[in-house]
Amino acid sequence: MLTKNELADIGVLDFQIFLNSLSVTDILIGNGFSINLCERLMYDSLCDLFNKSASNEIKSIFKGFETTNFEKVLEALSNTEKVGSILRRDMKVIRSLKSELKSGLISTIHATHPKAAEIKDTMLRSLAQDFEPFTDIYTTNYDVFLYKIILASNMLSEMNLESFELFNDGFYEEIGNGKLGFVDFNLYPRNLVYLHGALFLFAPMGNTFKLKKLDDGIEFIKLIKQYLDDDEFPVYVAEGKSEEKREAVNNNYYLRTAHNKLKDRDSEVLVVYGFSFSKSDDHITSVINNSKTKQLIISIRQRDSVKEVEKELSRLRVKFPKIEVLFFNSDTLFTFDYPKNYYG
């Protein structure tokens, strides 16, 4: 691995240097952040993992629809079941495939996501401290980590242990049965914005809501299963090509609003951590290129050679031809190895 000095020689600096010299306000968080907290989240595609144990029938349906989107397949199976019922056909096979799809997705989520007991409060409070310089957090992650971190940040403020501005995520309308409806991002000074949705967001009638019971430490996987049993699917965009993701975003009011918030940011500086800007996320790249952003400060993880790092720096610069792209050592922003500031 390269030393800090070797990285600095090719323009990959400690994050503190940028924090001291630039007006840092917002941050975009990708899957690299969650992987640092739980290596099981290394799978970008739940569908790829699901297919390792799926039946040939289910695999052929995904292939036939040319999709990796669970929701599209579930919708197709549900519609087929309805038509069959109207025509009084035996739908036993379809019901079996629906059951396999739902239970397989739940098993896949369970295999990749941490249990509540694995998410240590000390680590959440420590990371809340690391997020202190940032006003808005934008993320393409669909797990529960960042939501838990903003709750920890708010708790520290409310207990007068820190003077952080409060966070919200736009969901603050009580709509009953443990649900909070999305309103806007204007009520609180700091926001967590789910650019690709999250596994605890649902929009059965087009109006997106969040499962409030997450606040009570209930295993959110159990809650997801309850909604899947009613053929309601989480609002999350994690599968497919960039064009498919863009279409999914445009079809949901909350996701459109989230992307517009990223595009319409007032700040000219955006920090990026753990986000690769791969081809499947070109829609995010496009939003940033069409925003007021003038400087991107992107995390770079350790590699074995200067040549490897320089190749990555060049790839990222090409994606943003009109934006100054700067780089920082990913080891110098967040503390994952040991939590600091235990707060007694």
Per-region residue spans from a language model:
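Single-residue recognition of alpha-helix boundary sites
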Residues: 41, 152-154, 285
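Surface-exposed cleft-lining segments at the edges of enzyme active sites
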Residues: 108-115, 167, 242-249
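A Trp-anchored, charged/polar loop motif used as the substrate-binding/catalytic surface
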Residues: 8-13, 116-123, 171-180, 246-262
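Gly/serine-rich nucleotide phosphate-binding loop at the start of the catalytic core
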Residues: 1-148, 157
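Extended, H/D-rich, highly charged conserved domains that either
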Residues: 25, 65-72, 77-88, 128-242, ...
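Residues at the C-termini of beta-strands that transition into short coil/loop
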Residues: 50, 141, 196-199, 300, ...
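SIR2/sirtuin-family catalytic core signature
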Residues: 1-27, 33-37, 245, 253-344
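Short, flexible loop segments at boundaries between secondary-structure elements
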Residues: 55-60, 170-187, 294-312
